[in-house]
Amino acid sequence: MSAPQVGVLALQGDTREHLAALREAGAEARTVRRLDELNSVDALVIPGGESTAMSHLLREFGLLEPLRARLAEGMPAYGSCAGMILLATEIADAGVAGREALPLGGIDMTVRRNAFGRQVDSFEEDVEFEGLDGPVHAVFIRAPWVERVGPDVEVLARAGGHPVAVRQGKMLATAFHPEVTGDRRVHRLFVASLS
């Protein structure tokens, strides 16, 4: 069986780190910036960055509606931090009208942006992660948390009493950045779900 073709949305954020993590996890990974690139992948990673800026860039690059359509059709996706925000069906504090973060609707959840605080409030913490042996060292940078999950959403990890990792079918999202730690278990979990 050939390796899954996984794209990393390369408009902003930890693109290189996700590409490296996906390759180490056994995927064939490449960047996605254009519609033809989006249409050529089996799954997509939406990296961290700034969710309102990423929404703006998705519109500018003509990817917003095609990406929503691919997700609605069942394309697997993994979102970290801002990627988690964008994969939500609802964003609790989307931002200023006209420059707000736009939900893509992949996971039935409500997410609050910057819920753990501003940049200076960023932190690291070991979290227990359902389905993985041992804790995951989680790096939270202006991180969101999940305020509501739908009935088909599994909560995989919590921090501060709030869900910070969730899965719905072949959609995975984390409020933290596993791509920057060298621990590839979250990426391996996502890649394994593609087979």
UniProtKB/Swiss-Prot annotation:
State the InterPro entries in the record.
Answer: Class_I_gatase-like, PdxT/SNO, PdxT/SNO_CS
Query: Where do the catalytic residues lie?
Result: C81, H177, E179
PROSITE patterns found in the cross-reference section: PDXT_SNO_1, PDXT_SNO_2
User: A GO biological process this protein is involved in?
Assistant: pyridoxine metabolic process
Q: What reaction gets catalysed by this protein?
A: aldehydo-D-ribose 5-phosphate + D-glyceraldehyde 3-phosphate + L-glutamine = pyridoxal 5'-phosphate + L-glutamate + phosphate + 3 H2O + H(+); L-glutamine + H2O = L-glutamate + NH4(+)
A single MF term (Gene Ontology): glutaminase activity
Q: Keywords, A to Z? A: Glutamine amidotransferase, Hydrolase, Lyase, Pyridoxal phosphate
Q: Which GO terms describe its cellular component?
A: cytosol; glutaminase complex
Q: Which CDD domains has this protein been placed in?
A: GATase1_PB (cd01749)
E.C. number, please?
A: 4.3.3.6, 3.5.1.2
**Official protein name in the record:** Pyridoxal 5'-phosphate synthase subunit PdxT
Pathway terms, separated by semicolons: Cofactor biosynthesis; pyridoxal 5'-phosphate biosynthesis
Family that this chain belongs to: Belongs to the glutaminase PdxT/SNO family.
Q: Which organism is it from?
A: Mycolicibacterium vanbaalenii (strain DSM 7251 / JCM 13017 / BCRC 16820 / KCTC 9966 / NRRL B-24157 / PYR-1) (Mycobacterium vanbaalenii)
The record describes the protein's role as: Catalyzes the hydrolysis of glutamine to glutamate and ammonia as part of the biosynthesis of pyridoxal 5'-phosphate. The resulting ammonia molecule is channeled to the active site of PdxS.
